[in-house]
Swiss-Prot record:
It is linked to Multiple pterygium syndrome, lethal type: Multiple pterygia are found infrequently in children with arthrogryposis and in fetuses with fetal akinesia syndrome. In lethal multiple pterygium syndrome there is intrauterine growth retardation, multiple pterygia, and flexion contractures causing severe arthrogryposis and fetal akinesia. Subcutaneous edema can be severe, causing fetal hydrops with cystic hygroma and lung hypoplasia. Oligohydramnios and facial anomalies are frequent. Myasthenic syndrome, congenital, 3A, slow-channel: A form of congenital myasthenic syndrome, a group of disorders characterized by failure of neuromuscular transmission, including pre-synaptic, synaptic, and post-synaptic disorders that are not of autoimmune origin. Clinical features are easy fatigability and muscle weakness affecting the axial and limb muscles (with hypotonia in early-onset forms), the ocular muscles (leading to ptosis and ophthalmoplegia), and the facial and bulbar musculature (affecting sucking and swallowing, and leading to dysphonia). This is Acetylcholine receptor subunit delta. Keywords: Cell membrane, Congenital myasthenic syndrome, Disease variant, Disulfide bond, Glycoprotein, Ion channel, Ion transport, Ligand-gated ion channel, Membrane, Phosphoprotein, Postsynaptic cell membrane, Receptor, Signal, Synapse, Transmembrane, Transmembrane helix, Transport. NCBIfam families: LIC (TIGR00860).
């Protein structure tokens, strides 16, 4: 009898020692997953008609970037899951007062919540951290993730725009009959409230340098028209309404564009003889084309709207093109001559009298004789009459050799002076015959100079018409440029996000305005 008794006692002692070799967590895990027969493929419900309540919350750690060309929002978040699994309950006193158990996520049932509007084809969470299981059956999972979600970009008011991006979560594995999605609930002063916003921890949040978060609401969307077994029946969407910080684009794009566009007004100050009027205008046009090309690389290739900066550049390019045409017309007017064009009286009155007065242009001084010139002209008549008498009294030989005789000391002429003609008519006829070639030559010179003066005056009139057109276009183009620029950019300045996240809903969806249940 002693042998069997000793054997049984030894076996009992070995069993006790084996149980003592396991720690409390290992014993608890064996109890939950082996002894109770836990199956992670089955939903944690007692009846198949029941649904599992899954609560979600989103904590934003960093808004990494928003790529407009790809229409992709990249965020660093922590997505918080919470549900109850009655199969994972235990009595903490029986297992060394263990109230929380940390398990790998592949050991328990998961609701398989995925990001529907992802933009990289990765639906699952890349890093699977441990799941916290509490002794009363509550399961808590907080995995980190970097999501690349699609965000339709509205480029209408770029760079004074704001965007409404969202992260839409749902379960692609279970329908609305099997799980019920809801927002996480917190408690304050014994009152509970749903967390209807994206959580941001000020200490752990990194602010984005380009975008400012204006609203961050969260909402459970249920489509009553969709059947219960449809994946589109329910979802939880976290919205990010963000506003662009335009300082970078103002300094690097807008200010250079505006300055270059306004340089085209200097074309009207350049004289036409410089030959650089069209060159300056075309240079401005090329610079605007380069800026338009740079901006097109920053925005998505969409035909839904034209960005604000694109509107300004197109407006400027059209205006500069018109300035180039005006420069060609001004140069054509400036280099006109009386031999090719006739300056009509109507054009003279409009461009040489009316418009210069309205545009406050200084008129050139009239080419009239000065008072001194008039005195000299009147006194010259006496010299001419004395010269005529002198020529009448002197013979031709005396006139020809008068200087030579004085040079050789001959004070007396060898020939007798010619006497004046007997009659005045004969004298006048002789004088007329002698002076006619000189008078004809003088008349030819005077007529030629008069024609040349008229030619130059009319050419100067064409130049003045060109200057008047330049000044008129300066007074027209400058206000058009200023008003057009102000009208275009004021649209963006007054383009502000709505005061509330959802139109028609007065609730602000922020932590300061909790809705207690």
């Amino acid at each position: 009898m002693e042998g069997p008794v000793l054997t049984l006692g030894l076996l009992a002692a070995l069993a006790v020692c084996g149980s003592w070799g396991l720690n409390e967590e290992e014993r608890l895990i064996r109890h939950l997953f082996q002894e109770k027969g836990y199956n992670k493929e089955l939903r944690p419900v007692a009846h198949k008609e029941e649904s599992v309540d899954v609560a979600l919350a989103l904590t934003l750690s960093n808004l990494i970037s928003l790529k407009e060309v790809e229409e992709t929002l990249t965020t660093n978040v922590w997505i918080e899951h919470g549900w109850t699994d009655n199969r994972l309950k235990w009595n903490a006193e029986e297992f060394g007062n263990i109230s929380v158990l940390r398990l790998p996520p592949d050991m328990v049932w998961l609701p398989e919540i995925v990001l529907e509007n992802n933009n990289d084809g990765s639906f699952q969470i890349s890093y699977s951290c441990n799941v916290l299981v509490y002794h009363y059956g509550f399961v808590y999972w907080l995995p980190p993730a970097i999501f690349r979600s699609s965000c339709p970009i509205s480029v209408t008011y770029f760079p004074f725009d704001w965007q409404n991006c969202s992260l839409k979560f749902s379960s692609l594995k279970y329908t609305a009959k099997e799980i019920t999605l809801s927002l996480k609930q917190d408690a304050k002063e014994n009152r509970t409230y749903p967390v209807e916003w994206i959580i941001i921890d000020p200490e752990g949040f990194t602010e984005n340098g380009e975008w400012e978060i204006v609203h961050r609401p969260a909402r459970v969307n249920v489509d009553p028209r969709a059947p219960l077994d449809s994946p589109s029946r329910q979802d939880i969407t976290f919205y990010l309404i963000i506003r662009r910080k335009p300082l970078f684009y103002i300094i690097n794009i807008l200010v250079p564009c505006v300055l270059i566009s306004f340089m085209v007004n200097l074309v009207f100050y350049l004289p036409a003889d410089s030959g650089e009027k069209t060159s300056v205008a075309i240079s401005v046009l090329l610079a605007q084309s380069v800026f338009l090309l740079l901006i097109s690389k920053r925005l998505p290739a969409t035909s839904m709207a034209i960005p604000l900066i694109g509107k300004f550049l197109l407006f400027g390019m059209v205006l500069v093109t018109m300035v180039v045409v005006i420069c060609v017309i001004v140069l054509n007017i400036h280099f006109r001559t009386p031999s090719t064009h006739v300056l009509s009286e109507g054009v003279k009155k409009l461009f040489l009298e009316t418009l210069p007065e309205l545009l406050h242009m200084s008129r050139p001084a009239e080419d009239g004789p000065s008072p001194g010139a008039l005195v000299r002209r009147s006194s010259s008549l006496g010299y001419i009459s004395k010269a005529e008498e002198y020529f009448l009294l002197k013979s031709r030989s005396d006139l020809m050799f008068e200087k030579q005789s004085e040079r050789h000391g001959l004070a007396r002429r060898l020939t007798t002076a010619r006497r004046p003609p007997a009659s005045s008519e004969q004298a006048q006829q002789e004088l007329f015959n002698e002076l006619k070639p000189a008078v004809d030559g003088a008349n030819f010179i005077v007529n030629h100079m008069r024609d040349q003066n008229n030619y130059n005056e009319e050419k100067d009139s064409w130049n003045r018409v060109a200057r008047t057109v330049d000044r008129l276009c300066l007074f027209v183009v400058t206000p058009v440029m200023v008003v057009g620029t102000a009208w275009i950019f004021l649209q963006g300045v007054y383009n502000q996000p709505p005061p509330q996240p959802f139109p028609g809903d007065p609730y602000s969806y922020n932590v300061q305005d909790k809705r207690f249940i």
